Curated annotation (Swiss-Prot):
Similarity-based family: Belongs to the methyltransferase superfamily. RNA methyltransferase RsmG family.
HAMAP family cross-referenced by the UniProt entry: 16SrRNA_methyltr_G (MF_00074)
Name of the protein in question: Ribosomal RNA small subunit methyltransferase G
Predominant location: cytoplasm
EC number(s) reported in the record: 2.1.1.-
GO cellular component: cytosol
Chain positions recorded as S-adenosyl-L-methionine binding sites: 55, 78-80, 106-107, 122
Annotated InterPro entries: rRNA_ssu_MeTfrase_G, SAM-dependent_MTases_sf
Ranges annotated as spanning the membrane: none
First-tier enzyme category under EC: transferase
Keyword annotations of the record: Cytoplasm, Methyltransferase, rRNA processing, S-adenosyl-L-methionine, Transferase
Protein's job: Specifically methylates the N7 position of a guanine in 16S rRNA.
Amino acid sequence: MKKESLIKNYIKEIVNAPFNLTAIKNEEEAFHLLALDSLLPLEKMNLIGNFLDVGTGGGVPGVFIGIMFKKLKGTLIDASRKKINYVKNVCIKLGIDNLEFVHGRIEEQIDFIEKFDNVFSKAVAELRIILELTVPYAKVGGRILLYKGKEYLKELNDAKNAIDVLNVDLEDVVEYEILDRKRVLLIFEKKDKVNGFPRRYNRILKNPL
């Protein structure tokens, strides 16, 4: 099956899921706001190795990345068993075979520390929080790729301490538009190991970096 057909078939499955997997219930809108929003900022990027998608929800962006970059091995994790099992079963049905699926909280995945070349997350939390939930799982020299909206400059300013403590540099800001909405992909590079992170989620929320 061609990549575009796979993407459209996947969208049909998640939009019509028997529970609220995504708030978007129109397939054309979902194609833009879920698939294109995930893939457009990656079109000129050379992604190699493996990737982790933190808080994948309805498989966004991980499934779309897996479809477009077949050579990448991906791991998708979500705290909702119902969501991750549905996404897994749809991928099996469609023959998407380069992805693994994990039910659990990311901060409890000790075995994932420094195992991934690329760590993605979309629409999970504000920047200073999601950095703590993603950076520890990237290899030194690996990238953390985070999708954000038009308020990203404020989030970057609020995340100055987190960026310093977690030993990352902002490598690039990819700006783009989806349905006249301003979007960015923030790309960080991990400079060095980081010890003691992530903390327990309640501590992260109570005392963000």
